[in-house]
Amino acid sequence: MEIDFMRILATIINFIILILILKHFFWDKIKRAIDARQEAIDETILKADEDAEKARRLRLDNERILKSAKEEGRKLREEQKKEADRIYKEIVDDAHREAEAIINRANIEIQREEEKVKYELKQQVVDISVMLSEKALGESIDESKHRELINDFIEKVGI
């Protein structure tokens, strides 16, 4: 096989002419398409970087908000516990005061009843003494004077 230099030279010239024609008619369009594609890729990368930064900021904000919410929840829980403890103590103290008041009223009532019973007993003793005296003496004596004597006697005895 023999090499034909003329044919090679003609092919090279044809190729150069083809490239010049393609460059003249299509190079600007191809360059614009490549540049547009490169610009779109750069914008996509820039947008992805911006979105990543925005996501990072949002994550940090969310973590800060979550931490703040947890702290606020803890404080609120502590305040509610303190309030519940205060109310519990207040209820217990009120119950103690009310129980003491009931006991005091009961003691006063018991003392009144005791005084009433003593008075009634004293009256019955006086009545019985007057009856016995009348029966023993066989006559009626001045009842008011007799009651006064019996009351003095009962006072001295301590009934």
Curated annotation (Swiss-Prot):
How does it associate, per the subunit comment?
A: F-type ATPases have 2 components, F(1) - the catalytic core - and F(0) - the membrane proton channel. F(1) has five subunits: alpha(3), beta(3), gamma(1), delta(1), epsilon(1). F(0) has three main subunits: a(1), b(2) and c(10-14). The alpha and beta chains form an alternating ring which encloses part of the gamma chain. F(1) is attached to F(0) by a central stalk formed by the gamma and epsilon chains, while a peripheral stalk is formed by the delta and b chains.
Ribosomal protein as a keyword of this entry, yes or no, is no
Q: Where are the transmembrane segments?
A: 8-28
Which CDD domains does this one have?
ATP-synt_Fo_b
Give the membrane topology: Single-pass membrane protein
Gene Ontology cellular-component terms for this entry are:
plasma membrane; proton-transporting ATP synthase complex
Family the entry assigns: Belongs to the ATPase B chain family.
Q: What does this protein do?
A: F(1)F(0) ATP synthase produces ATP from ADP in the presence of a proton or sodium gradient. F-type ATPases consist of two structural domains, F(1) containing the extramembraneous catalytic core and F(0) containing the membrane proton channel, linked together by a central stalk and a peripheral stalk. During catalysis, ATP synthesis in the catalytic domain of F(1) is coupled via a rotary mechanism of the central stalk subunits to proton translocation. Component of the F(0) channel, it forms part of the peripheral stalk, linking F(1) to F(0).
**Cellular localization per UniProt:** Cell membrane
Q: Which organism is it from?
A: Clostridium perfringens (strain 13 / Type A)
Entry superkingdom = Bacteria
Q: What is this protein called?
A: ATP synthase subunit b
GO molecular function terms attached to this record: proton-transporting ATP synthase activity, rotational mechanism; proton-transporting ATPase activity, rotational mechanism
Q: Which NCBIfam families match?
A: ATP_synt_b (TIGR01144), PRK13461.1 (NF009992)
The answer to whether the entry has keyword Membrane is: yes
Q: Which InterPro entries match?
A: ATP_synth_B-like_membr_sf, ATP_synth_b/b'su_bac/chlpt, ATP_synth_F0_bsu_bac, ATP_synthase_B_chain
The gene it comes from is atpF
Mind listing the UniProt keywords for this protein, alphabetically? ATP synthesis, Cell membrane, CF(0), Hydrogen ion transport, Ion transport, Membrane, Transmembrane, Transmembrane helix, Transport
Cysteine pairs forming cystine bridges in this chain are none
